[in-house]
Amino acid sequence: MSHKRLGFFTRLLDKTSPQARYRLATEQIQRAERAGFDTAWIAQHHFHEHEGGLPAPLVFLASVAAQTNRIRLGTAIITLPMENPLRVAEDAAVLDLLAAGRLEIGLGSGGTPTSFLPFGLTSDQRREAFTNHLNTLLRAWRGETLGHPDNRLYP
């Protein structure tokens, strides 16, 4: 039988300050690592504290990576239509290096319809934006040129 991997998913839902939420989630992931979990996954949510309120998952996971050693760290999900795909590609590449290859990336088109408006999108545009941003992100990760022959992702 192949080795089974055990992971868990968490959201920042504790009824406390944002700073305490990040601390508690970090401690939860540290405990999971000590308990033998293989992966920890977090969700991205813009604007809505009752949904987990974590607008910058890669920044948070960079902190967690510095405080853990083995557990793989994943995004479930980054709402790609709301992000600059080149920034996601660069930030993820840097974080994966800092985390010694422990980063897992999950991407999605998003859910909360009102969250798209501040990013200049409507909820109806999210699928097309996701497809376009995913193509750009994958081109960057494959090392393809980006807008000019001299431009390639360098983490």
Question: Language-model features: where?
Answer:
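N-terminal beta1-alpha1-beta2 module of alpha/beta enzyme domains
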Residues: M1-Q67, I71-L73
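Internal, glycine-rich beta/alpha segment that forms the wall or movable "lid"
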Residues: S2-K4, N84-P155
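Active-site beta-loop-alpha junctions enriched in small/polar residues
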Residues: R11-L13, H45, I78-L80, G108-T112
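Short coil/turn segments at secondary-structure junctions
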Residues: L12-T16, T79, L117, L121
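Short, surface-exposed alpha-helical recognition segments that flank or form part
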Residues: T16, A20, E83, Q125
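Glycine-rich "substrate-gating" loop/helix at the edge of Rossmann-like oxidoreductase active sites
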Residues: H48-G52, I78-N84, T122-S123
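A generic, residue-level signal for flexible/boundary positions that often mark functional hotspots
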Residues: Q67, R72-A76, G110-S115
